[in-house]
């Protein structure tokens, strides 16, 4: 893979930062604020599991990536037009949510979730593709850090701030804030000029064939597909239970938002630059194993969460924050590997195809976690997460040569 890109300018960095923050604000709103609100209104774990399952629509972003690769760049650019379209769609969803009490209308709630997930998928796909054409290889580790820090900042906005607005001023104010944020992003996109980049040529049949042939290349292979599906699943399995478990331990929605959308992001913002330094100075292969191994004892500690809660009520939040820190250190490395294995001419398709697999594994794990927690209890569900983490660690070790190839061939 060639790497003849010039360094990104200030407008590129600004859009990558603000756009990534907005994207993860949507995630924070969906997975933290919305779930906490619904749990507070008496929704069961089985009902909440459907929210996670609908969220897996975002994994279909690879289909939107195919549309982006097939359509020639127009007057709005290769990715900018899609970003504008998605942001307009999201604005419509938040406008609808501001006008209707979705907590009392399950059908409308699910409709909003579907629309939110679909538009978020389009936005995330375009933003990831833009990152690939803007960032040269040497900046991708740092670009992964930017996205990870934006993820934490976005959760603070979409989770804690939205929950605070909801608890203090109601649903209209919370949805209105998200609408205002969307309109601000529209304004920035209108003034942004996307750099030129080559587009993939060929028919829809050729693009469909690429979805299969991508996994048959030496740098990927079907083993890479399995690894991407599994690598984030253990953490996602545990993370899906954070909101309902904190509620069951007696924490209010505002406290839950403070823990998950302020405590975790602030702690992660502090340690994330360390991951960027690691990415620039150490081989990805070593980092993957070292940072993944940090999760194992922390996942195991979750099986004792009830006992620790009896010792001190704030020990469970400390466990949750520590586990999230371990994943925060790993995430930039995963993002860098995804970009390494993406060709510039098919940036949106390659990166979105890979990240869609990661998301599909994460949302599937979250759906299963809530169902298992309802059926066998939180403690046994956390043991399942531990066993899953050990299995994934073994898969990483057996396929460690894949990390060597991406580093050697992307210089």
Language model regions located:
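Intracellular juxtamembrane helix-capping segments at the cytosolic ends
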Residues: 34, 121-135, 328-343
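Helix-to-loop junctions at the C-terminal end of transmembrane segments
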Residues: 61-77, 270-284, 373-374
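Helix-loop boundary and gating motifs at the non-cytosolic
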Residues: 2-58, 222-227, 231-246
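Glycine-rich segments within core transmembrane alpha-helices of 12-TM secondary carriers
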Residues: 61, 141-166, 355-366
């Amino acid at each position: 893979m060639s790497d003849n890109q010039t360094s990104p300018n200030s407008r590129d960095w600004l859009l990558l930062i603000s756009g990534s923050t907005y994207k993860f604000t949507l995630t924070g709103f969906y997975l933290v604020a919305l779930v906490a609100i619904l749990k507070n209104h008496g929704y069961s774990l089985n009902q909440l599991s459907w929210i996670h399952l609908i969220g897996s629509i975002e994994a279909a972003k690879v289909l939107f990536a195919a549309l982006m690769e097939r359509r020639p760049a127009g007057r709005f650019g290769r990715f900018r037009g899609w970003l504008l379209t998605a942001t307009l769609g999201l604005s419509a969803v938040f406008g609808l949510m501001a006008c209707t009490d979705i907590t009392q209308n399950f059908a409308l709630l699910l409709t909003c979730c579907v629309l939110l997930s679909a538009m978020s998928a389009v936005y995330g796909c375009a933003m990831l593709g833009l990152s690939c054409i803007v960032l040269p290889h040497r900046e991708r580790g740092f670009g992964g850090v930017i996205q990870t820090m934006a993820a934490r900042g976005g959760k603070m906005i979409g989770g804690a701030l939205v929950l605070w607005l909801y608890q203090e001023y109601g649903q209209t104010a919370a949805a209105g804030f998200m609408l205002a944020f969307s309109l601000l992003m529209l304004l920035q996109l209108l003034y942004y000029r996307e750099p030129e980049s080559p587009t993939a040529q060929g028919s829809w049949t050729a693009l469909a064939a690429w979805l299969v042939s991508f996994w048959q290349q030496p740098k990927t292979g079907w083993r890479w597909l399995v690894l991407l599906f599994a690598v984030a699943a253990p953490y996602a399995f545990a993370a899906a239970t954070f909101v309902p478990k904190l509620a069951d331990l007696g924490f209010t929605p505002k406290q839950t938002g403070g823990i998950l959308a302020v405590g975790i992001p602030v702690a992660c913002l502090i340690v994330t630059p360390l991951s960027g330094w690691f990415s620039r100075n150490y081989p990805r292969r070593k980092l993957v194993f070292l940072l993944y191994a940090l999760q194992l004892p922390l996942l195991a500690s979750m099986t004792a969460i009830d006992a620790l809660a009896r010792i001190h009520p704030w020990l469970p939040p400390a466990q949750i924050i520590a586990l999230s820190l371990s994943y925060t250190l790993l995430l930039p490395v995963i993002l860098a590997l995804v970009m390494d294995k993406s060709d510039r001419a098919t940036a949106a398709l390659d990166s979105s195809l890979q990240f869609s697999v990661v998301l599909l594994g994460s949302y599937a794990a979250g759906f299963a976690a809530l169902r298992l927690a309802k059926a066998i209890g939180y403690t046994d569900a956390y043991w399942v997460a531990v066993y899953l983490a050990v299995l994934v660690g073994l898969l990483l070790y057996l396929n460690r040569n894949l990390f060597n190839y991406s580093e050697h061939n992307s210089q």
